[in-house]
A protein has these predicted regions:
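Conserved SAM-binding loop of SAM-dependent methyltransferases across substrates and taxa
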Residues: 1-10
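Conserved SAM-binding motif I beta-strand of class I
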Residues: 11-16
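Conserved SAM/SAH-binding beta-strand->alpha-helix loop
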Residues: 18-20
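Short alpha-helix immediately C-terminal to the canonical SAM-binding loop
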Residues: 22-26, 117
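S-adenosyl-L-methionine
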Residues: 26-54
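Mobile active-site "lid"/loop adjacent to the S-adenosyl-L-methionine
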Residues: 55, 64-93
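Conserved Class I SAM-dependent methyltransferase catalytic core
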Residues: 88-145, 149
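Conserved small/polar residues in nucleotide/adenosyl-binding loops
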Residues: 190-192
């Protein structure tokens, strides 16, 4: 929903495998009067060829499950487990299918955990995507990064730019200056 305010794209399509989560997303779209700009589809990421075809999107944003299959403690809440663990899709599925639906030169934006960065880059190269930009996200400047933001380009060259780290909070636990600036820009885009 925030992306509709931030970009000039004419339409956004969301894909969600969990029916209840897809219904919640659809309700948010309707409550925000964005039905003409946003479509939510309940479907399996591994079926993008059937759902969409090949080379149909300019941009794909993904927030895949962070935990590799068979690792970490899987909680009792199935919906949360599917969101956090590679139960219904793997990192390879996400990157392969993203590459499939992107036009040549299209961009994929992903948020993931830094410990998976090696896998992400290898899989991007395997599926003819080039990592273009990378940003490590730190909870505080004194703490290790716990997220990585990565942009890939389908068929792009191999030059990668590592951007300055994004720090979320200062040492007192207050929003960092970077985050306040980002929130300010986002709020200026939203028309209430």
């Amino acid at each position: 929903i925030l992306m509709t305010a931030k970009t000039a794209a004419s339409h956004f399509t969301g894909l969600e495998i969990q029916e209840e989560v897809a219904k919640m997303a659809s309700r948010s779209v309707m409550l925000n009067h964005l039905g003409d700009k946003v479509s939510i589809i309940c479907g399996d990421l591994k079926n993008t060829k059937t759902l969409f075809g090949k080379g149909v999107f300019n941009v794909v944003t993904v927030n895949p499950p962070y935990m590799a299959g068979g690792s970490g403690l899987v909680g009792a809440d199935y919906s949360k487990a599917v969101s956090r663990h590679e139960i219904l899709c793997s990192l390879e599925d996400v990157i392969r299918e993203s590459a499939n639906v992107l036009v040549a030169g299209g961009r994929m934006y992903m948020v993931h955990r830094p410990y998976r960065l090696g896998d992400i880059i290898c899989l991007m190269k395997q599926y003819k995507m080039s990592p273009r930009r990378l940003c490590m996200v730190h909870p505080k400047a004194s703490q290790e990064a716990n997220l990585v933001l990565i942009e890939g380009i389908r068929g792009g060259n191999t030059q990668i730019r590592v951007e300055a780290p994004l720090v979320l909070f200062d040492e007192d636990g207050q929003e960092s200056r970077q985050i306040k600036m980002i929130h300010g820009r986002l709020l200026s885009l939203i028309h209430i």
